[in-house]
Amino acid sequence: MATPSNKNSKSHKRNRRGHIGLNVPNIVLDQTTGEYRVSHRVSPSGVYNGKQVIDKK
């Protein structure tokens, strides 16, 4: 197994891992129901882009 020949400092380690992080979900206000939902997803009522795509039972 490969091992580093020299010690990796905290700054080098953190610079390498800089792209790893939490992403904040893009939350928008649904115009049909008035509730918040994640964008580009079907709302809990089954409406997407102003059209009923899933029949709610």
Swiss-Prot record:
Transmembrane segments: none annotated. It comes from the Bacteria. Residues 9-19 have a biased composition (Basic residues). Pfam families: Ribosomal_L32p. One of its GO terms (molecular function) is structural constituent of ribosome. Keywords: Ribonucleoprotein, Ribosomal protein. One of its GO terms (biological process) is translation. InterPro entries: Ribosomal_bL32, Ribosomal_bL32_bact, Ribosomal_zn-bd. The keyword Ribosomal protein applies. Residues 1-25 are annotated as: Disordered. The keyword Ribonucleoprotein applies. One of its GO terms (cellular component) is large ribosomal subunit. NCBIfam families: rpmF_bact. Belongs to the bacterial ribosomal protein bL32 family. This is Large ribosomal subunit protein bL32. The gene is rpmF.
